[in-house]
Amino acid sequence: MSMSSSNITSGFIDIATFDEIEKYMYGGPTATAYFVREIRKSTWFTQVPVPLSRNTGNAAFGQEWSVSISRAGDYLLQTWLRVNIPQVTLNAQLGPTFGLRWTRNFMHNLIREATITFNDLVAARFDNYHLDFWSAFTVPASKKIGYDNMIGNISALTNPVAPGGSLGSVGGINLNLPLPFFFSRDTGVALPTAALPYNEMQINFNFRDWPELLILTNTALVPPASPYVPIVVGTHLSAAPVLGAVQVWANYAIVSNEERRRMGCAIRDILIEQVQTAPRQNYTPLTNAMPTFDIRFSHAIKALFFSVRNKTSSAEWSNYATSSPVVTGQLVNYEPPGAFDPISNTTLIYENTNRLGAMGSDYFSLINPFYHAPTIPSSIGYHLYSYSLHFFDLDPMGSTNYGKLTNVSVVPQASPAAVTAAGGSGAAGSGADYAQSYEFVIIGVNNNIIRISGGALGFPVL
């Protein structure tokens, strides 16, 4: 039986191989010594999470409301929305073919729009589509399960319940949504709330109503009929669902008196990210397989997100595949055999030039995110084109000023599967065996500059 062996003396052989190429790679006055660590000191601070106070409106389904951003903390680091989802019971008198479930990505789709304002100046906004794209391209696999648990992708909410069954649990289920405003991206761009005494700062929400989020299906309805059934209170539910406790939490940094004094002493410009969503437009592969959509974005665009959303069910928001989910008993197959990317290839045109000519969807869904994004989406239908070498990086690494471009348009050619599904001629059980309808969604992520001056926030470049 052999014994493993090694000795220190052999390492000196490696050291003796130092030659010209090693002179290029090692040594010199700026070389790093990996065995003598230098401590990088920070300023003295602490951080504390606090709930924000309600300002206007009622935090309920279908309502607009807002919270005030406190100036008690020095820097606002992160914010998140915490919502209690009520238990919902399907009427026991219905037939056994009925099933009730909440939409996927519930916390994304609850939000029609969220904004942050400074004296009514909207500094940033996002909607449910941006939340879908942002999480698909930035949440790493190591956090994906936890993120799904936070936003409602759990069996207790998304698996259908039969008549007499209940979604959720007694007392409701608490869900959390990290709000991806610009100040949450890095502590270096945290919002200096203590330096803004002359701004009334608010986070504003527009919530969708519960019928836009709750899905009722009846599998007794066979193609070409759609299995989706409009929900009627009194027939399907005993009462309309009502949200439980709703809170917005904020994580603040509190700094030393010396640093606080310096915060308002000089003008400060901060490079931030903003989101622009183009108006959604109908996508009809049966009548026009190569539609042209005009894009009117502005500022320095660093990344484009786009997709074709399947809107066959108005409450099935986060479906970017050719087919609808297929319900079998108490299970849902969100990517059944008929689920494919609705887009075959895409052309991006501006200044009468093909910036990208008929690039296959595999480029936008796999290759581009492989090189330029933190992660590749695990679901069908997400597309990215990044002008930045790494769009998740805060430093400028590439962009194009869409405000200086003319006649910008995108041409997403429909895939054969989209044409088949739009006509409802897919195979039985494919989710495409009844007519599917679609809309085109495109979002731009741009850089902008905010200026902190004289106790207020503004835009030096609008």
Curated annotation (Swiss-Prot):
MF terms (GO), sorted A to Z: structural molecule activity
Acetylation recorded as keyword: no
Superkingdom per UniProt: Viruses
Compartment list: Virion
SUPFAM superfamilies in the record: Group II dsDNA viruses VP
GO cellular component terms, semicolon-separated: viral capsid
Alphabetical keyword list: Capsid protein, Late protein, Virion
Presence of keyword Glycosyltransferase: no
Assembly with partners or alone: Homotrimer.
Functional summary from the UniProt entry: Major capsid protein that self assembles to form an icosahedral capsid. Represents around 50% of the total virion protein mass.
Protein family according to the UniProt entry: Belongs to the NCLDV major capsid protein family.
Protein's name in the database: Major capsid protein
Organism: Costelytra zealandica iridescent virus
